[in-house]
Amino acid sequence: MSTALFDLTGRRALITGSSQGIGFALAKGLSAAGATIVLNARSADKLATAADQMRSIGASVDVLAFDVTDHNQVRVSVDAFEASHGPIDILINNAGMQQRGPLEDFPADAFERLLQTNVASVFHVGQACARHMIKRGMGKIVNIASVQSALARPGIAPYTATKGAVTNLTKGMATDWARYGLNCNALAPGYFDTPLNAALVADPDFSTWLAKRTPAGRWGNVEELVGACVFLSSDAASFVNGHTLYVDGGITASL
């Protein structure tokens, strides 16, 4: 089989929340596959630093600063970028946040922030990009879900709810938009060593538990998400729609 199926040359990929962590790793991976990258975050300073790092390895990079939870700001930003730079062919909805705490005491305003950042953002940015993709009759949307889309642990019930919503919103996107030539899927990481998981990575008891609970016996490295993301962003996934691909070291396969 030719590797041309996975070639992203000539395509432009917007990755939300891509100044660090998983988003930045995916940006580097899609660039290595040939894509032009559009980095996104709220902080212009963080974006500039990330863009400089990308360019130092030869990547073609643009930056687009907007708040993924602000519907109007998202739409205006995406429309203006498409008009000035050209089509966004691939969208990676990666922006997200975590907040832990006992469910019985979890603050309502914190729950709302999780919903806005983890779920509403997928709707806002997905809709803004899909309107252009539909006109062109093609596009790839990859929503970053989580192992918590399928499994729960104490102390993260609100986060678990948001990631379950992402997988179902992905199915809805596929159901509505596949007829227009869009492929909408989700990528669900297991436990990866990222800034979002810094507190867990620093906890030796949790790492010991994770090594026993995960068949692969370890934390994931963010680079190990790249292959799955390139696949879902490429022609190789032309008949894949509404699917959630777990990259989790086997944790969802094992009791």
Region spans (language model):
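Short C-terminal tail/terminal secondary-structure segment
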Residues: S2-A4, L151, V230, N241-L255
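Substrate-binding pocket helix/loop in short-chain dehydrogenase/reductase
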Residues: P102-L103, A110-L115, I141, F206, ...
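The beta1-alpha1 cofactor-binding region of Rossmann-like NAD(H)/NADP(H)-dependent oxidoreductases
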Residues: A44-D45, A65-S77, A108, E223-E224
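Alpha-helical segment proximal to the catalytic Tyr-Lys
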Residues: R131, T175-R179, S238
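Conserved glycine-rich cofactor-binding loop
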Residues: R12, S19-G21
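Residue(s) in the substrate-gating loop at a strand-loop-helix junction
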Residues: S146
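Active-site helix of classical SDR
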Residues: G126, T162, T170
